């Protein structure tokens, strides 16, 4: 049995899950959802044992932090947003004080440059052949980028064009860049997916997914890396 409680604005606030096994004392686990002043979800408290179908937020928090809960000062996950009307997430913390100290998932919103890890090669295609344009790069500021840094400090980048298509995902392995490029034709059809090894050995037959389309943009041919 699940009891869902909403706040004055109709948002999910507290959920209590009750055991329905007959002949036993019904156990209850409650979760709590908190919101910031802008109405955005911020803290989600871990399921906590309670003794009633509804408990106040203060009582649930005290129980969660105490010895009958998690014995932890931060038994909740937390989402932090940038100070802008875009409501974009900048950090996400896992539950537990140990994760809060230097272990968030951090998100940065950037644009591309013409050098270093923020640069992106410009591949084009007529639908049949791939053109690397002599190693040309996208001009600075032409692509939107999202940099994600995980709990262990590993960074990855996603580059999107003005049509909101992903053109590159870059996973960092130390200082090594592992790049996967996505190449579209003039109609927006995905024609090539270049695997990271392609940047070392430009062999489409070994290191690329290839697709072809008819005049109705239906995929009529596909080739996997290494397939004959």
Indicate residue ranges for each PLM-predicted region.
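Beta-strand elements of repeat-based all-beta scaffolds
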Residues: 1-228
């Amino acid at each position: 049995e699940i009891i869902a409680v909403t706040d004055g604005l109709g948002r999910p606030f507290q959920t209590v899950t009750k055991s329905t096994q007959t002949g036993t004392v019904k156990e209850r686990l409650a979760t709590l959802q908190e919101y910031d002043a802008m109405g955005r979800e911020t803290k989600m408290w871990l399921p906590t044992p309670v003794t009633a179908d509804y408990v106040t937020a203060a009582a649930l928090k005290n129980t969660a932090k105490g010895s009958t809960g998690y014995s932890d000062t931060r038994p909740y996950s937390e989402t932090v947003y940038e100070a802008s009307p875009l409501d974009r997430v900048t950090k996400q913390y896992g539950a537990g004080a140990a994760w809060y100290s230097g272990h968030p998932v951090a998100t940065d919103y950037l644009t591309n440059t013409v050098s270093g890890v923020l640069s992106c090669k410009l591949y084009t295609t007529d639908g049949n052949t791939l053109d690397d344009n002599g190693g040309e790069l996208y001009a600075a500021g032409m692509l939107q980028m999202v940099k994600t840094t995980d709990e262990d400090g590993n960074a990855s980048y996603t580059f999107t064009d003005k049509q909101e298509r992903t053109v590159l995902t870059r996973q960092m392995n130390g200082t090594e860049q592992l790049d996967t490029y996505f190449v579209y034709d003039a109609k927006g059809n995905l024609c090539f997916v270049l695997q990271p090894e392609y940047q070392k050995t430009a062999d489409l037959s070994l290191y690329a997914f290839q697709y072809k389309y008819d005049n109705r943009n239906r995929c009529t041919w596909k080739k996997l890396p290494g397939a004959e």
